[in-house]
């Protein structure tokens, strides 16, 4: 029994230090893929349709790793496009300043996600099944708590660090970097009626969301790359899903 307890404390999976780093990067990348493919391109913009298998997987995974509710995220993002760079934009660095969006982007998101008028006007067409009503929306915070338990069981004490990185990943890169730097630094392929910028021509770390100006120019396109030298890894994943009959 003592040996079993020690094994549990040390974690089910034992790896060298670099193995934990790689595992953390993979786990956080799955989260980013879920945000860009499921929440952003599928739910908010209807740029593609997802088969129930990846759709339910991403919903479950994002519940575990972010606690974000599909209706809330979709509504806030749609309002951002509808009111971009105005006083009604939930997270514009033009209005709030780049420092505030970079450092407090997740707080700006949570504030708008609690706005019933925003949810009513922009949250249409999002999941409203039993799972959404009774688990994902009703108990959004319990998902991240469950993820902590899973990480500790799998990886031992270092699982707490892995979990902490998972929890910070979306607020830093999605809520902060994309919503902030994506409207402040970078280059523009299109003179859109907003301050959107392409942060980098290679969209890998943030799933292709780095190509933010391209997205604002063609918001309903599932592909965010435009020039021959630009790369959108999210589009690559979508094409793979299409080949497997899991996306259209």
PLM feature spans:
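Non-catalytic, topology-defining segments of multipass membrane proteins
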Residues: 1-177, 181, 221-248
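Active-site-proximal inter-transmembrane loops
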Residues: 123-131, 185-211, 215-218
């Amino acid at each position: 029994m003592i040996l079993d307890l020690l094994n549990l404390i040390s974690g089910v999976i034992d790896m060298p230090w670099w193995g934990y780093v790689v595992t953390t990067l993979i786990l956080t990348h799955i989260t980013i893929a879920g945000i860009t493919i499921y929440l952003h391109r599928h739910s908010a913009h209807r740029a593609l349709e997802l088969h129930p298998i990846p759709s339910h997987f991403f919903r479950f995974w994002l519940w575990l790793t972010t606690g974000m509710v599909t209706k809330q995220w979709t509504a806030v993002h749609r309002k951002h496009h509808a009111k971009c760079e105005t006083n009604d934009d939930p997270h514009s660095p033009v209005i709030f300043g780049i420092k505030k969006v970079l450092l407090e982007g997740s707080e700006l998101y949570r504030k708008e996600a609690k706005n019933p008028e925003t949810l009513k006007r922009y949250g249409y067409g999002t999941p409203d099944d039993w799972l959404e009503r009774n688990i994902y929306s009703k108990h959004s915070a319990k998902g991240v708590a469950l993820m902590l338990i899973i990480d500790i069981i799998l990886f031992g004490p270092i699982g707490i660090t892995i979990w902490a990185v998972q929890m910070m990943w979306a607020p830093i890169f999605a809520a902060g970097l994309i919503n902030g730097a994506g409207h402040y630094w970078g280059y523009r392929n299109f003179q859109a009626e907003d301050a959107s910028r392409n942060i980098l021509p290679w969209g890998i770390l943030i799933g292709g969301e780095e190509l933010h100006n391209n997205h604002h120019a063609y918001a309903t396109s599932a592909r965010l790359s435009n020039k021959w030298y630009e790369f959108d890894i999210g589009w690559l994943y979508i094409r793979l899903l299409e080949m497997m009959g899991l996306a259209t």
